[in-house]
């Protein structure tokens, strides 16, 4: 194992999981960082000491609405406009992950920031007229969310989804359709820098009670999104599929399902910009990354990205902390259709191990040769993985937080640190005990903070376990 060599890191804003108590919003301080040998960004933290506001290693509170700025990477030979197809995964990100390409790093950060607006704009105040919708109008969403260069994209449509549940509406939540993200298109000025017209769709993760209740529905079911060729062997998680395809007749947003809203708007934008170089980029966090993958598959399966006498429009998913979506048939079909998925994951994030905690792509064959009978029923990840490694004993819930992901992708990397990828549970416990019981770090107050945050994360994990029926 290589020796740990750490450097100080610049200050970045930190936003932890939303809707926590002030005690759970404890800052991550004294972070150290190194790079793992296998596409992994490794962070070690010593956060049991009291937070020092003046420390250059302290991360400020998430109260700031400013997005995390792109990394000041070294100058590159080619501009994005020349290599955008490779950045969108045309070669499956070969030679771009290890080491991480500065341009790819910049684009992951940019899409992550644009995705964060789906959280910052979501209104969870029951007394608000915009409850469960977006707090801002389409013209102001990116600016009000603190997005760098808010004029780079024009938001064209808000997307609403209805959890597919046969339960009476929860009190104070009369409207079951919720705002889950938006569709945007790059501006004329941005086209020059990007090298193409980029159609962007973002999806936030699970927030409301109805969405958690929808999580109780879980099994693999045929997607059947193409009426002319149902492909019963292509199966996806039923809860995600229900959220994607169900509508709400009593919703003020109309009868359209999330799927119908999206396909209609994407088709409109592609017709509007016919003749231009176009890309379709889908960015999602947690549950939202699953919807992004379903939409990407849907677009490609229906042939919406095909153009006569021209190259197909690239369809790319940037998945942050995403769970598995479907079975091996779904994975193979996505690959056949040319759908590209870059999964940004944290080795310490349990959600990325679900569904299929036990029966997954690692349990489909015997010795990597003989396919086992149940392989078609195993959940399987799609795409290429960029693995991060971060953990904070006082803010355990941060292992799944979007802005923590963005911050760590955007940090400079230094020396290497080997980590056993297959020992998730042991690694988690070892880091916890090491940080909690190291010399001089036994203050009761910080132990209480750690316990509170651990309970918060475990509650979230248990909900996901119910969702994914992992047992």
Swiss-Prot record:
Disruption phenotype: No visible phenotype under standard growth phenotype. The keyword Plastid applies. Residues 1-88 form a transit peptide. GO terms for cellular component: chloroplast; lipid droplet. Residues 44-71 are annotated as: Disordered. Its EC number is 3.1.1.26, 3.1.1.32. One of its GO terms (biological process) is negative regulation of cell growth. Keywords: Chloroplast, Hydrolase, Lipid degradation, Lipid metabolism, Plastid, Transit peptide. It catalyses: a 1,2-diacyl-3-O-(beta-D-galactosyl)-sn-glycerol + 2 H2O = 3-beta-D-galactosyl-sn-glycerol + 2 a fatty acid + 2 H(+); a 1,2-diacyl-sn-glycero-3-phosphocholine + H2O = a 2-acyl-sn-glycero-3-phosphocholine + a fatty acid + H(+); a 1,2-diacyl-3-O-[alpha-D-galactosyl-(1->6)-beta-D-galactosyl]-sn-glycerol + H2O = acyl-3-O-[alpha-D-galactosyl-(1->6)-beta-D-galactosyl]-sn-glycerol + a fatty acid + H(+). Induction: Induced by wounding. Induced by methyl jasmonate. SUPFAM superfamilies: alpha/beta-Hydrolases (SSF53474). Expressed in leaves and seedlings. Not detected in flowers, siliques or roots. The keyword Phosphoprotein does not apply. A motif (GXSXG) lies at residues 284-288. Optimum pH is 7.0. Signal peptide: none annotated. Gene3D superfamilies: alpha/beta hydrolase. The active site is at 286 (acyl-ester intermediate), 349 (charge relay system), 400 (charge relay system). Overexpression of DGL causes a dwarf phenotype. This is Galactolipase DONGLE, chloroplastic.
């Amino acid at each position: 194992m290589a020796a740990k060599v750490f450097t100080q890191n610049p200050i970045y804003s930190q936003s932890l999981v939303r809707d926590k108590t002030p005690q759970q919003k404890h800052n991550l301080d004294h972070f150290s960082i190194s790079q793992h040998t296998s596409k992994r960004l490794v962070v070690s933290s010593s956060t049991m000491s009291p937070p020092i506001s003046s420390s250059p290693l302290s991360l400020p509170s998430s109260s700031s609405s400013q997005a995390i700025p792109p990394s000041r990477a070294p100058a590159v030979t080619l501009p994005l406009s020349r290599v955008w197809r490779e950045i969108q995964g045309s070669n499956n990100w070969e030679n771009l992950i290890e080491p991480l390409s500065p341009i790819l790093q910049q684009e992951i950060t940019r899409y992550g920031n644009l995705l964060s607006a789906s959280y910052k704009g979501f209104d969870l105040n029951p007394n608000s007229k915009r409850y469960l919708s977006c707090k801002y109008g389409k013209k102001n969403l990116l600016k009000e969310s603190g997005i760098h260069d808010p004029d780079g994209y024009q938001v064209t449509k808000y997307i609403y989804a209805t959890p597919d549940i046969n339960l009476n509406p929860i009190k104070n939540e009369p409207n079951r359709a919720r705002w889950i993200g938006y569709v945007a298109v790059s501006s004329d000025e941005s086209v020059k820098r990007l090298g193409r017209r980029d159609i962007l769709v973002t999806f936030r993760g699970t927030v409301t009670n109805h969405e958690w209740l929808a999580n109780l529905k879980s099994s693999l079911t045929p997607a059947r999104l193409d009426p002319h060729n149902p492909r019963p062997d292509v199966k996806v998680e039923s809860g995600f599929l229900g959220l994607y395809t169900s509508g709400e007749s009593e919703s003020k947003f109309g009868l359209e399902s999330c799927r119908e809203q999206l396909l209609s708007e994407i088709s409109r934008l592609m017709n509007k910009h016919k003749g231009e170089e176009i890309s379709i980029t889908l960015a999602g966090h947690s549950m939202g990354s699953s919807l992004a993958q379903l939409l990407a598959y849907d677009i490609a399966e229906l042939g919406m990205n095909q153009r006569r006498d021209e190259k197909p429009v690239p369809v790319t998913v940037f998945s942050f902390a995403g769970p598995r979506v479907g079975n091996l048939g779904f994975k193979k079909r996505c690959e056949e259709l040319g759908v590209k998925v870059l999964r940004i994951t944290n080795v310490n994030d349990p959600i990325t191990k679900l569904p299929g905690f036990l029966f997954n792509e690692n349990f489909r064959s015997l010795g990597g040769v003989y396919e086992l009978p149940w392989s078609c029923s195993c959940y399987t990840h799609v795409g290429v993985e960029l693995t991060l490694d971060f953990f904070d004993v006082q803010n355990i819930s941060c292992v799944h937080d979007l802005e923590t992901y963005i911050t760590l992708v955007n940090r400079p990397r230094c020396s290497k640190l080997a980590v056993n990828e297959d020992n998730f549970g042991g690694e988690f416990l070892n880091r916890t005990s090491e940080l909690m019981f190291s010399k001089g770090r036994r203050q009761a107050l910080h132990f209480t903070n750690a316990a509170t945050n651990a309970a918060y994360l475990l509650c979230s994990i248990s909900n996901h376990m119910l969702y994914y029926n992992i047992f």
